[in-house]
A protein has these predicted regions:
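Long, charge-rich intrinsically disordered scaffolds of nucleic-acid metabolism proteins
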Residues: 96, 401, 407, 412-482, ...
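A glycine-rich phosphate-binding loop feature that marks nucleotide/adenosyl-phosphate handling sites
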Residues: 180-188, 319-323, 377-379, 403-410, ...
Length: 713
C-alpha cells in the first residue's frame, strides 16, 4: 500500500501535498510549524487537515507493521500462498487483517483442535464434499475409536461438526459479510436491570434503535448505564438473514444427506463462535466512533474557550465564593500581578454583609477596580446578590461577570499553583485564577488539565490517553495561533509552543530569571537543551515586544528576516518604520506578489504572510471572537417566563444541543431542533462555546432547575 496515495485519497488532497507533509513530520517538524511556516511545501494545508493526516499516518504505518508480522507468522507455518499474501497486503483495516489471520493464529485447544487430534478431520472434509450416499451418522461409524475417546458414531459426527464450525467461523469473507449484515439490519437493545430503580438512564429502560442510525451520545449514555449496572445491553442481529447466507455459502447440494448436518454446523458456528465476537467488535467500533465524535466536540469547545478574547487594561477583583470558610478575594492588576488578598463572610452561617461591603468598597476605591470576576460554584448566587447591592451603592462604574470555576480547585491545590503563589492559601489562589481567567483566558487555562475544564461530555468514560493527546493538540494549536510573549509567559504556556518540551520550557524561565529579559529571539539558542531544530520550530511563535529587532515582535520567522528587510527596502520602508507602526499600508504597495516573491527568493504564500504580519504586527486573533457579557444586575430562575427574550453565552456544546448561560445560575438548554429552521447534523454547525446568542425562553421548571430555550425568534 502506498501510504501517501491512500492518505491523499482519504483527505481529498494531492499526493504531493501528503508526501511533503509526511516528509516534514518525519524530519521532526510540528503540526503548528508546518501549517504556519511550510505552506509552499504542503500547498497551505490547515492544522486541522495536518492533524488528521498525522493520525492516519500513524494508523496506516501500524497497519503495515501488523501485516508484516502476520505474513511472517503464516510463512513460518509454511501456509502462505500468493493469493493470501495479496489479500493481506490489500487489507485496509486492522480488523480485515485479523480476519485473514484468524485461521493461522496460534490457538488454545478448542473443540475443533481436540476433534482433529482424535482423527476426525477426514470425516469433516467428507461431509463438506457433500457426495455421501449414506447418512453422515452412518459414515461416522467408520471413525469410532475408543482409544481416542470416540466411543460412538454420535461422538465422531459431533467432532466433525466442531471442526467444520470453526472453519466457518475462521472464514474472513463470511465474517466481513456478517458484520455488514448486522450493522445494516441489526438493532441495539437496552433494558433495565431493575425496572423500579430510579436513574438518569430511565429513557433507555426499554430502548431499541437501528445500529446504523445510533447517535454517538446515545451510545455513550447506554455504555455508561451498562457500566453502572442500570442497563442490560445486547445487539439484536438479523439471525435468519445471516443463517440463510451461511447456508447458501456452505450447502452446495441441498438434497444430499449432508444438508441437515451442514445447517446445524452454520447454526453452531454463528451462535457459538461468530455472534459473540461480532457483537463485541461492533459495540467496540460503535463506542470508538462515538468516543472520537465526543472528543472532537470536546476539542472544538475547548478551542473556543481558550480563544476567548482577553479583557485587557482592567484591575480585576477575583471572587471565589463559599459559605462556612468565607469568600476569598484577590485583586489583580492589568498585568496579572496580585495586589491584595482577603477573606469576607457575607454568606451563611456568618452573614456579615455590611462588613463585607465595607471591605469591598475600600478595595474598589484603593485599587480602582473596574471588574469583578465571580466564580460560579457554591454560594455564587448569594455572592452575586451582594455584588448587585454593592454596585447600586457605589459611584464607581464597576461591572461583574460570572466565570466558570471548572478546574480552579484542581489548579489551586496543584504543585504549580503552590510554586506560583507560595504565600497564599488554596482559596486565595483560586480567587487570583478567577481574575486572571478574564484577563487572559489562554494563559490561565493552560495551567489546568484540559479534561478538568468542563466543556465535554462523558470524558471520564473515554480512552484517557487518546483524549489527553487530542486536547493537548487543541491547546498547542491555540497557543501557537496566538503566540507567546517570551519575557512574560509561564512555563505552563511555553511548554505548548511548537518544539518546546516541558524541560525546555522550565529552562527558558530559569534563563530569564538568571539573565533578565530576552533582547532577541536568537538568545533562545543559549537556553539549555534548546538546539537548532527546536529553535527552528519555536522561534516564530515567540514574541519580544521591546527587543532589539522589531521583527521579533511579529510572527515573521527568523529564517525570513533577510527577505523581510529586502522587502521593506524595495517598498521604501526601514525596520524603524516597523517599530513605529508606519507600515500599515504596505499591502497596497505590492503590485505583483508572484514576481516580488521570485525577486526575494521566497514562496508567494510566505510573502503574503510576511506582508500581513507587517501590516498588523502582534495582532491577536482572539480579538475577532465575541466579547463576554458584563452584568450589573441579577436575574433569578423564578423571574423567567415563557416568551422572554434574553442574550446569553454558550457554555457547552454537546451532540444534541447547547447549554446557554443567561445569567440565572442555571444554564438553559437549546435543543438541536431549536437552533435554526434548516436541518443540521450537529450543533457546532450553528454555535460554538463563547458565542453570544439571543434566545427565547420556551419553558421553566423551577423545581427541577431546568430551562428550555430556543434560538428561533
Amino acid at each position: 500500500m502506498d501510504i501517501n496515495t491512500k492518505i491523499a485519497e482519504e483527505l481529498g488532497i494531492r499526493k504531493e501535498q501528503a508526501a511533503a507533509a509526511v516528509k516534514l513530520i518525519d524530519e521532526g517538524c510540528t503540526i503548528p510549524f508546518i501549517a504556519r511556516y511550510r505552506k509552499e511545501a504542503t500547498g497551505a494545508l490547515s492544522d486541522e487537515i495536518l492533524r488528521n493526516l498525522y493520525d492516519r499516518l500513524v494508523y496506516l504505518r501500524n497497519l503495515e507493521d501488523k501485516k508484516q508480522t502476520v505474513l511472517a507468522s503464516i510463512e513460518e507455518q509454511g501456509k502462505l500462498t500468493e493469493e493470501l499474501r495479496a489479500q493481506i497486503l490489500a487489507a485496509e483495516t486492522q480488523v480485515a487483517v485479523d480476519d485473514l489471520y484468524r485461521p493461522y493464529r496460534p490457538k488454545r485447544r478448542t473443540r475443533a483442535t481436540i476433534a482433529k487430534e482424535k482423527g476426525l478431520e477426514p470425516l469433516a472434509n467428507l461431509i463438506l464434499l457433500q457426495k455421501m450416499t449414506v447418512s453422515p451418522l452412518e459414515e461416522a461409524k467408520n471413525y469410532i475409536n475408543p482409544e481416542k475417546e470416540v466411543s460412538t458414531a454420535e461422538d465422531a459426527l459431533n467432532g466433525a461438526k466442531d471442526i467444520l464450525a470453526e472453519s466457518v467461523s475462521d472464514n474472513a469473507d463470511f465474517r466481513t459479510h456478517i458484520r455488514e449484515l448486522t450493522m445494516k439490519h441489526g438493532q441495539l437493545l437496552s433494558a433495565a436491570k431493575d425496572p423500579e430503580a430510579e436513574s438518569v438512564y430511565e429513557m433507555y429502560y426499554e430502548f431499541s434503535e437501528s445500529l446504523s442510525k445510533l447517535a454517538g451520545h446515545r451510545i455513550l449514555a447506554i455504555s455508561r448505564g451498562e457500566k453502572e449496572k442500570f442497563l442490560i445491553v445486547k445487539i439484536d442481529a438479523p439471525v435468519d438473514r445471516i443463517l440463510s447466507y451461511l447456508d447458501r455459502k456452505l450447502i452446495t447440494a441441498p438434497s444430499a444427506p449432508t444438508a441437515a448436518v451442514l445447517h446445524e454446523v452454520t447454526e453452531d458456528a454463528y451462535n457459538r463462535l461468530i455472534a459473540p465476537a461480532i457483537e463485541r467488535e461492533i459495540r467496540s467500533d460503535l463506542f470508538e466512533k462515538a468516543e472520537d465524535g465526543a472528543i472532537r466536540v470536546f476539542g472544538k469547545n475547548l478551542e473556543q474557550l481558550l480563544m476567548q478574547p482577553p479583557i485587557a487594561g482592567q484591575v480585576v477583583l477575583g471572587w471565589d465564593p463559599a459559605f462556612r470558610t468565607g469568600c476569598k478575594l484577590a485583586v489583580v492588576d492589568p498585568t496579572g500581578k496580585v495586589l491584595d488578598t482577603t477573606v469576607i463572610y457575607p454568606t451563611a452561617p456568618q452573614n456579615r454583609v455590611e462588613e463585607a461591603k465595607a471591605v469591598l468598597k475600600k478595595l474598589i476605591s484603593k485599587y480602582h477596580i473596574t471588574l469583578i470576576s465571580l466564580g460560579n460554584g457554591t454560594a455564587s448566587r448569594e455572592s452575586e446578590q451582594i455584588i448587585v447591592q454593592l454596585l447600586k451603592e457605589i459611584p464607581e462604574p464597576v461591572q461583574y461577570i460570572i466565570v466558570n470555576e471548572a478546574g480552579a480547585s484542581v489548579y489551586s491545590a496543584s504543585k504549580l499553583a503552590t510554586e506560583e503563589f507560595p504565600q497564599f492559601d488554596v482559596g486565595q489562589r483560586s480567587a487570583a485564577s478567577m481574575a486572571r481567567r478574564l484577563q487572559d483566558p489562554l494563559a490561565e487555562l493552560v495551567k489546568i488539565d484540559p479534561k478538568s475544564i468542563g466543556v465535554g461530555q462523558y470524558q471520564h468514560d473515554m480512552n484517557q490517553k487518546k483524549l489527553t493527546e487530542a486536547l493537548d493538540h487543541v491547546v498547542e494549536d491555540c497557543v501557537n495561533r496566538v503566540g507567546v510573549d517570551l519575557n512574560t509567559a509561564s512555563a505552563s504556556l511555553l511548554e505548548y509552543v511548537s518544539g518546546v518540551s516541558k524541560a525546555i520550557a522550565k529552562n527558558i524561565v530559569v534563563y530569564r530569571e538568571e539573565n533578565g529579559k530576552f533582547a532577541s529571539r536568537s538568545q533562545l539558542l543559549k537556553v539549555a537543551k534548546l538546539g537548532p531544530k527546536a529553535y527552528e520550530q519555536c522561534a516564530g511563535f515567540m514574541r519580544i515586544s521591546d527587543g532589539k529587532n522589531p521583527l521579533d515582535a511579529t510572527g515573521v520567522h527568523p529564517e525570513s528576516y533577510a527577505a523581510t528587510k529586502q522587502l521593506l527596502e524595495t517598498l521604501g520602508y526601514t525596520l524603524s518604520d516597523v517599530t513605529d507602526r508606519n507600515v500599515a499600508g504596505i499591502s497596497k504597495k505590492v503590485r505583483d506578489y508572484k514576481k516580488l516573491a521570485q525577486d526575494l527568493e521566497i514562496g508567494e504564500l510566505t510573502l503574503r504572510d510576511i506582508v500581513k504580519e507587517l501590516e498588523t504586527p502582534a495582532r491577536d486573533p482572539r480579538e475577532d471572537m465575541p466579547k463576554p457579557i458584563l452584568r450589573s444586575d441579577v436575574l433569578e430562575i423564578k423571574d423567567l417566563t415563557p416568551g422572554m427574550v434574553l442574550k446569553g453565552t454558550v457554555r457547552n456544546v454537546i451532540d444534541f444541543g447547547a447549554f446557554v448561560d443567561i445569567g440565572v445560575h442555571q444554564d438553559g438548554l437549546v435543543h438541536i431542533s431549536q437552533m435554526c429552521d434548516r436541518f443540521i447534523k450537529h450543533p457546532l454547525e450553528v454555535v460554538s462555546v463563547g458565542d453570544i446568542v439571543e434566545v427565547k425562553v420556551l419553558s421553566v421548571d423551577v423545581k427541577k432547575q431546568r430551562i428550555q430555550l430556543t434560538m428561533k425568534i
